[in-house]
């Protein structure tokens, strides 16, 4: 009997992790379905159209109808394509997009200093860098395996674009790491407790670094648009030039996986903006330790989750708005912006923040 109890106890940990992964995946998929609808509604609203409004009340079930349509379509593989790589590319892209979310904390835990996260890594930022940098391989594989010039050109554009703007994003994140002194994402969020004035985008607790951190937030937002191939930086899948870029030959479920991976990365960037700059799950007004000590921990966790989701939704709305109102950049303008403006600016910010931490932060 004791052996059976011990074996059940040893299985409880892995089962709990699997349950967390399953719940997280389900919530992500449902979130993507409705965020995709929001994206289309914003685009339609700017053009003074109604957008999807037929399937379900207010068009809420449109994404699920599209999902069913993709699943029922036949998978067509071009005659000259490398079949194995052609199928593997969207699977790799979607899998990497899901795996990255394992280190994202979404709400405070019931115990002090903990959070709702699958893997609370001390090197969470490094983990995100490592996984997200692999995403370009799925796009290159898909473009090359299609055996067509338009997908291949789109894949090459994507590789150059993602590498260019990953450098700027990296330097921006380094400024936050220098301020906090940790690469743990939960620690980064907890460092912004105390109200909106302590959010890193304003950094009043590190005055006068507001003149540095506000531009860093703007650079991160614009670089995130380029990193996720969103307009006005959708050069890899430019419809007017490359038909649909690396996705030209894809349809049915493989195309659905590419699109799912793209939107997962977009929401990931929104979550990163929330964690690094917008206070994570902390509200704009601090309740104070006296009041929070008397509130149920679960209520604090749920309110933190609501704040986190609201901020992510706001960031996604900005992504959708930019898509609807900003025209596409030329490729040379895209490269010039990344290498000649964002890179030196973010590098200068790293030097300024490092100097502040060394000479001011160290003395306080």
Curated annotation (Swiss-Prot):
It catalyses: a quinone + NADH + 5 H(+)(in) = a quinol + NAD(+) + 4 H(+)(out). Pfam families: NADHdh. It comes from the Bacteria. InterPro entries: NADH_UbQ_OxRdtase_su1/FPO, NADH_UbQ_OxRdtase_su1_CS. One of its GO terms (biological process) is aerobic respiration. The chain crosses the membrane at residues 15-35, 84-104, 123-143, 169-189, 206-226, 257-277, 302-322, 341-361. GO terms for cellular component: plasma membrane. GO terms for molecular function: NADH dehydrogenase activity; oxidoreductase activity, acting on NAD(P)H, quinone or similar compound as acceptor; quinone binding. It is an enzyme of class 7 (translocase). It is a multi-pass membrane protein. Keywords: Cell inner membrane, Cell membrane, Membrane, NAD, Quinone, Translocase, Transmembrane, Transmembrane helix, Ubiquinone. It is found in: Cell inner membrane. Its EC number is 7.1.1.-. NDH-1 is composed of 14 different subunits. Subunits NuoA, H, J, K, L, M, N constitute the membrane sector of the complex. Belongs to the complex I subunit 1 family. NDH-1 shuttles electrons from NADH, via FMN and iron-sulfur (Fe-S) centers, to quinones in the respiratory chain. The immediate electron acceptor for the enzyme in this species is believed to be ubiquinone. Couples the redox reaction to proton translocation (for every two electrons transferred, four hydrogen ions are translocated across the cytoplasmic membrane), and thus conserves the redox energy in a proton gradient. This subunit may bind ubiquinone. This is NADH-quinone oxidoreductase subunit H. It comes from Hyphomonas neptunium (strain ATCC 15444). The lineage of its organism: Bacteria, Pseudomonadati, Pseudomonadota, Alphaproteobacteria, Hyphomonadales.
């Amino acid at each position: 009997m004791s052996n059976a109890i011990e074996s059940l106890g040893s299985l409880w940990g892995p089962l709990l992790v699997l349950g967390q992964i399953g719940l997280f995946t389900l919530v992500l998929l449902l979130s993507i379905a409705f965020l995709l609808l929001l994206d289309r509604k914003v685009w339609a609203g700017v053009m003074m159209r109604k957008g999807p409004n037929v399937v379900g009340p207010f068009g809420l079930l449109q994404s699920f109808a599209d999902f069913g349509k993709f699943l029922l379509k036949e998978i067509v593989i071009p005659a000259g394509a490398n079949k194995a790589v052609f199928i593997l590319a969207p699977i790799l892209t979607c899998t990497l997009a899901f795996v990255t979310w394992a280190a994202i904390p979404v709400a405070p835990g019931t115990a002090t200093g903990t959070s709702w996260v699958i893997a609370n890594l001390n090197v969470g930022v490094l983990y995100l860098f490592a996984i997200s940098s692999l995403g370009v391989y799925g796009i290159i594989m898909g473009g090359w395996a299609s055996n067509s010039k338009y997908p291949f050109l789109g894949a090459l554009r994507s590789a150059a674009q993602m590498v260019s703007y990953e450098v700027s994003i990296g330097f921006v994140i380094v400024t936050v790491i220098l301020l906090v002194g940790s690469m743990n994402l939960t620690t980064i969020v907890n460092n912004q407790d105390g109200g909106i004035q302590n959010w890193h985008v304003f950094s009043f607790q590190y005055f006068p670094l507001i003149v540095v951190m506000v531009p860093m937030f703007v650079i991160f937002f614009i670089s995130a648009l380029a990193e996720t191939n969103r307009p006005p930086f959708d050069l890899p899948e430019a419809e007017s030039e490359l038909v649909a870029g690396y996705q030209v030959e894809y349809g049915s479920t493989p195309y659905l996986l590419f699109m799912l991976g793209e939107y997962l990365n977009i929401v990931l960037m929104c979550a990163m903006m929330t964690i690094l700059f917008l206070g994570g799950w902390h509200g704009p007004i601090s309740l104070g330790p006296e009041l929070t000590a008397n509130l149920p921990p679960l209520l604090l966790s749920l309110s933190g989750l609501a704040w986190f989701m609201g901020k992510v939704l706001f960031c996604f709305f900005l992504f959708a708005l930019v898509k609807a109102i900003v025209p596409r950049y030329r490729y040379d303008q895209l490269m010039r912006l990344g290498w000649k403006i964002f890179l030196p600016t973010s590098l200068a910010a790293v030097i300024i923040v490092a100097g502040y931490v060394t000479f001011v932060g160290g003395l306080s």
